[in-house]
Amino acid sequence: MKVIGLIPFKNEEHFLPTYLSNVKPICDEIIAVDDHSIDNSRKIMEDAGVMVKGYEDTEKLKGGWTCGLIRQHLFNYGREAGGTHFVCLDADETFTSNFVPIARDIMSQLEPGEKVRMQWLALWKSCTHFRNDYTVWSNNFKDFIVRDDTSLDYNYGYMCEGRTIGPNTDETQRTLELEHGAVLHYQFSFYNNFQLKQAWCQIGELVQKGQGAIHEINSKYSITMLEDNVGMTQMPEEWIENIPLPDIPNFDPEWNEKYFMRKNLLPDIYRHFDEYGVEYFKDLNVWHIPQLREKLNA
């Protein structure tokens, strides 16, 4: 058994130590693709012994999203390196600490094409509590680990790709009980950054799909604003012990740009504004972000 972690990243220097903390100990190797980061992401990964590959794609989607295409390359790299099992977490995720000691034993029991399906905990404006209510941000499960079957391919969609190769069915997925381990998703923990990224996604998607997609995009991303009657559950300390975290506030009411973790997002948005005009995007629900609202009202 050779376990390889596969990760695409772009400007994730703040989260990569978090990812590495509980992914590296269960992997024999990690292979990453750096999608043109302009921060210290690549150095952090290389210093940790990760094999980092660059990525060039002449058919890059004009909305600026290449993650699904990169995942295809990652599975090829993993196979070339002799991987039998692939761990597919993103940079703003890591495993709960209680999963680490049992992870390899669980993976060793998988048949070719089988996957470990784990609960995906949305840490909402917090690093110690996960969302637990009746919204789409609760009780989510996802395929994060797969034993390779070389007859399988990877499929993706624009900004909504899956993680592992092959179909997700009752026959291919083994669901891990929450008390044995889960995946911590820190995307929502640092809320200004979450909202900025969602605005970046919406604006990029409108560029990619055109004005006719306004209603579709607003409907799709309305779930990012579900703030009423939020239910939260505190995690046991043993789930999160020894996990390093970004040193920024969970929410900054002043929206100070020094706390923006991905330095490309705001410049990317401004570039679209310059190319298309701010009015092109006026019907999107992104203007709660002060920097964008200022551009609209200028």
Feature annotation, model-predicted:
Residues 2-4:
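Cell-envelope/extracellular polymer assembly enzymes that use nucleotide-activated donors
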Residues 11-26:
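Short, well-formed alpha-helical segments that are part of the catalytic scaffolds
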Residues 27, 83, 111-113:
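Short, high-confidence coil segments that cap the C-terminus of an alpha-helix
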Residues 64-72, 97-298:
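Catalytic-site signature of metal-activated, phosphate-bearing donor transferases
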Residues 68-85:
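Active-site nucleotide-sugar/metal-binding loop of Leloir-type enzymes
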Residues 82-94:
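Short beta-strand-to-loop acidic/aromatic patch adjacent to the donor-nucleotide binding site
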